A protein has these predicted regions:
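Mature catalytic domains of secreted/periplasmic carbohydrate-active enzymes
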Residues: 23-470
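Bacterial Sec-dependent N-terminal signal peptides
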Residues: 1-25
């Protein structure tokens, strides 16, 4: 199963602070435009959507893939195509000395060399299942407009290039199918803006911003073409790619009233094909943002509605040849914090242009999976509890609230202490260490619950369960 996994000869590990004890912000200069979180949330009224949301909230841990033509040279994602000033330095670093026009020609041309001959979707799905992931978010199309599915409405796709005769040329179909077979909930990432589409960026005009490069009010017929193009592609994904649970829409500047793509109609039509579909129109509160998506950050406090932090494992969304990896501790601690605050954690991985998931990714995910096999009861299918944090300890609860879980998030570079303590959440009887089922008595010291730790425990995050006195 590992024959197509590359072993890196030199790895630089970046043990980035997890933000476990305060709000974490993991954005770096290598990331593109970073979305915030919506200020408001509107609960859905459709019973099937509410049911699906509840099921999704049980899953807690999702794998997100950014994979496209940007993976060939290893340039994170497609934001360098945008001529806004914030991306100028990035373009110069990628293609020194090139004009913006030359850069665009070079970037569009990457489609001619994207040939992921080592892509094995079943292998990906098996790896991610073993790592403890429960749902998938896969980039069917980023802002560059390159489709990772065989769209009938454009030739700018993986199925029309060098990989057209590949075993899995309709990539998204095979990714969804492989992960679905492993029991994953399936999410289709789709970019609302499409910079390759002539009815969004007219190739005869300059492209000074991320927005349409023509006046929509003056050329409504051109914008109508784009509305239809978007509706057609989403309908393809909803009709021809099996059961889809989440429609994850990126590009929050495409919204009413200036860039109205008639999303209400699109989502209504999608739910005729996919009943209960969760719509995630990022950063746009209302009927089509069924859960919120703080990007590269964790909210400061608990939220009482559905949300997901999407954070990269490295310093970029897509694959890059010089990655800075976050640690196993960071992944586990971040998952504990997000879960205690009521969210789900979508961890992003970028496969290479060949379709390879790097060995250093696998090493980390394998260890995370082992931890979750022993301690996952404290994560999966849990809900929030009011007293959810004390120092390095995060608390979750089972659905009836009668069992609490305490997760000690071991800080990077530290050893387990002699004891763990917290205030509140007093156990009713002994506490159980999930990794081995052993029970411990607790004591009260200075108004705190204290648990003495035995010697010989592996130096990693610990999870305990106990009944409450409430």
């Amino acid at each position: 199963m590992r024959k197509h996994i590359r072993l890196l000869s030199v790895i630089t590990l970046s043990f980035i602070c997890s933000g476990v004890f305060a709000q974490g912000n993991f954005a770096t200069k290598d990331h593109g435009f970073v979305h915030g979180i919506s200020k408001d949330y509107e609960w859905p009224t459709d019973p099937e959507v509410l049911k699906k949301l509840d099921q999704w909230q049980d899953l807690k841990f999702g794998i997100m893939f950014h994979w496209g033509i940007y993976s060939v040279p290893g340039i994170s994602e497609s934001w360098a195509l945008c001529s806004e000033d914030r991306f100028t330095a990035r373009r110069k670093k990628i293609l020194p000395g090139a004009s913006y026009g030359d850069f665009k020609k070079w970037y569009w041309g990457l489609a001619k060399s994207f040939n992921p001959t080592k892509f094995e979707p079943a292998q990906w799905a098996e790896i991610m299942k073993d790592a403890g992931f429960k749902y998938l978010i896969f980039t069917t199309k980023h802002h560059d407009g390159f489709c990772m599915f065989d769209s009938k409405f454009t030739d700018y796709s993986i199925a029309k290039g060098p990989y057209k005769n590949g075993k899995y040329s309709n990539v998204a179909y095979h990714v969804f199918d492989a992960f679905r077979q492993q029991g994953f909930m399936i999410g289709a990432y789709f970019s609302k803006p499409d910079w390759h589409c002539e009815s969004y960026w007219d190739p005869a005009l300059s492209t000074p911003t991320r927005n349409p490069n023509y006046d929509i009010k003056k050329y409504p017929e051109t914008w109508a073409k784009y509305q239809q193009y978007t509706a057609n592609q989403i309908d393809e994904l909803m009709s021809d790619y099996g059961k889809i649970d989440i429609l994850w829409l990126d590009g929050g500047w495409v919204r009413k009233p200036k860039q109205d793509i008639k999303l209400d109609e699109i989502v209504d039509n999608a739910r005729k094909k996919q009943p209960g579909l969760i719509a995630v129109d990022r950063t746009i509160p209302g009927r089509n943002e069924n859960y919120q998506t703080p990007e590269l950050t964790i909210p400061k406090t608990q939220l009482d509605h559905p949300w997901e932090s999407n954070i990269t494992l490295t310093n970029t969304w897509g694959w890059n040849p010089k990655p800075k990896y976050k640690s196993v501790n960071w992944i586990i601690n971040t998952l504990a914090e997000i879960t205690a605050k009521g969210g789900c954690f979508a961890l992003n991985v970028g496969p290479s242009g060949e379709g390879i998931i790097e060995e250093e990714v696998l090493v980390r995910l394998k260890q995370v999976g082992k931890w979750l096999q022993k301690n996952g009861t404290a994560i999966y299918a849990t809900r929030i509890t009011p007293n959810y944090n004390y120092g390095k300890v995060w608390f979750t609860a089972n659905k009836d609230g009668k069992t609490l879980y305490a997760i000690y998030a071991l800080p990077e570079g530290e050893n387990l202490p002699e004891y763990i303590e917290w205030e509140g959440n007093e156990p009713n009887g002994k506490v159980t260490l999930l990794q081995n089922g052993k029970q411990f008595k607790y004591t009260r010291m200075d108004g705190k619950i204290r648990i003495m730790l035995p010697k010989g425990l592996k130096n990693e995050a610990l999870a305990f369960s106990f009944k409450t006195k409430g």
